[in-house]
Amino acid sequence: MSQTGDSSSFVEEPASPEARQRELERQVLGLEYRLRTEHSEAEMARLALERELAGMQGKYKQCMGELEAALADTRYLYEQNAALEARARAADEDAGGAAAAERAAAAEERARAAEARARELEEALQAARGEAAAAGRAAAGAAAGAAAAEQSGLLRKYEAEIERQMGELRALAERLAEREDEVAGLKAQRVLQAHRSYSAEEVEELGVLRRTLQEQLALSKELERANLEQANELKRLRQRSESQQFLQLENSKLRARLEKTDALRQQLDDLQLENVQLQEKLTKWEVYQADGSSPENVLHEMALAKQERLALVEQVGKLQLDLNNMKILNDELALERNQLLDLNKKYESSILNLKKLNYEIEQQKLLSFEECKLLRQQLDDLSEVDKDHTPDTRDRKKIQTLVDTYKNQTEDLTNELKKLNEQLLERSDLDGNPRKRRKASDDLAFNYSQRLNELQLRNKDLERRLANSDENASLLEEKLRKLQSLNEKKIRILQLRNNPLLKDQFVKQKQLTLLKQENLELAQQLDAQQGLEAVPRSVYERQQYDIQLLEDELFSINKRTTRLKEMFNRKSLEFIDAVNSLLGFKLEFQVGGKVKMIPCFKTDRYLIADLQTNTLKSNLDKVMPEWDAMLAEYVGKRQQLPCFLAKIMLLLAESSSSQ
């Protein structure tokens, strides 16, 4: 590359903004990758904490259930103790002996001791319940494995305490059983002392009682005899039913055999008809074989004719393919001839275009030299004008470098054009063939025009980038002036203390602050290039804040779920009351898809409907003699269970009004 005296030498410049931008982008990508990694690790830790929290809550619920059961047992023992104490007082009043009084006093003392022990156990259970609730709340806020281990140890300690208290409760139950036995003995002694001498009235009552027992015994024998008769009748009915089932089975087998016989008869008729048709075809064939040829000979000749036809079809296909190939070759030759003619015309026109292009390039060269002079003169004028200001040396050097590069490329292009023209002249002198000379000149003109187009496109690109840079600089300066001239005014707006929008803005502001601090520390750690595998404290604080937000959200969800459960229970009770008041049945939904219906007129009677097996169970048949008839009519025949229930309600209402 040739250089003039005015062109400046190459100067080392700092890294370009594009390189720094790429470096910053790589750093940002690295930080984003590390941020995503931290997010995934935090999510995994949160899921582990949720699983541990669910396990602790399950253990807490189990512990609370055991505590409730122990408390219920304690209350039951307390009630039994009170009842035994009352019975002991009654036995003390009834028994006149000193031994009975001493036993009653001892029993009363043991009852008081058991009551005191029961109260102590109840207080211990309440304390354990409070400690278990505190442990459950502490377990819900635990964030590490050590806290979970401590809570599990505490739960094991509570379980051991509960087992110990259950053992004590069982011992108290045994003692209560012993006291009940003693009270029963005292009652028996009191009864013996009160009934040692029987009067005449008692003897008469005993006789009446004996006669009543004899009558009941006779009645039971009659009922037993009637039961035996019914059993024999039932056995005879079962034998008849079995014989009827056997006859029905034999009848179905005979019917199946009869149907098979009909099918075989139909098949025999079809075969006979087919035989007749085949005999007719055979007679027709005998008419056509007058020359004595058999069907095998005819089939052989037909197969030979098919093979010959296939061979002829294959030959015709090959000939058709050869003909198509000849047509394609003829078309290709005609196309090549037309292309050669067009190429000849293009070669002739390219000579004229080269002459015009050479003249235009000379003109552009002169114009580019003049443009370079004008640009350098403008740069000098700008440098004289900007002497009082602080110039941007980097932009000036860049513009000056662009001008020098443009000038050098123009000179290189001119020299290359001269060399190409000299080579063209030498080839034209050495080679007398006009076709080869025309081809070489076409190649040189094509290369020259391609290089010129590339330089023009590059020049336009540089001009466009320069204009964009100037426009961006002017916009940034305008924004800077507006920001400097902006006077902020503080506006106070009256808001609620627990405003959801303000709370959301506070959460977002805190998250933004934590993320900025985390980004700054990560950038500092990345710039320092520390080899330690550690994360800054801001990352941990930000993750802790996210966990706190999730816990708040979980608390609100649990609160909402509890409210919905309460509402569901209340609405269920309202539904049951509405059904009871409208239909007259109190519904009780049991496990296994069963529904227990209690009528309002007979609360000691019920109907149990099993919706899975479609069965109905009731004890109303004892008060309704027409129960079986109604069941067969409305349920078995009409399949109308609502009508059956309405009929039951009408009958119960009539019976209650008549009573």
UniProtKB/Swiss-Prot annotation:
Region (Disordered): 1-24
Keyword Coiled coil belongs to the record: yes
Entry's Gene Ontology cellular component terms: kinetochore; mitotic spindle; nuclear envelope
Keyword field: Cell cycle, Cell division, Coiled coil, Mitosis, Nucleus
Composition skew (Polar residues), residue ranges: 1-10
Main location: nucleus
Biological process according to GO: activation of mitotic cell cycle spindle assembly checkpoint; attachment of mitotic spindle microtubules to kinetochore; cell division; mitotic DNA integrity checkpoint signaling; mitotic spindle assembly checkpoint signaling; negative regulation of protein import into nucleus during spindle assembly checkpoint; nucleocytoplasmic transport
Keyword Transcription regulation among record annotations: no
Protein origin, superkingdom: Eukaryota
Annotated compartments: Nucleus
InterPro entries, A to Z: Mad1
Pfam families for this protein: MAD
Coiled-coil annotated residue ranges, if any: 23-531
Membership in a protein family: Belongs to the MAD1 family.
Function per UniProt: Central component of the spindle assembly checkpoint.
Protein name, entry field: Spindle assembly checkpoint component MAD1
Origin species: Eremothecium gossypii (strain ATCC 10895 / CBS 109.51 / FGSC 9923 / NRRL Y-1056)
Gene name as annotated: MAD1
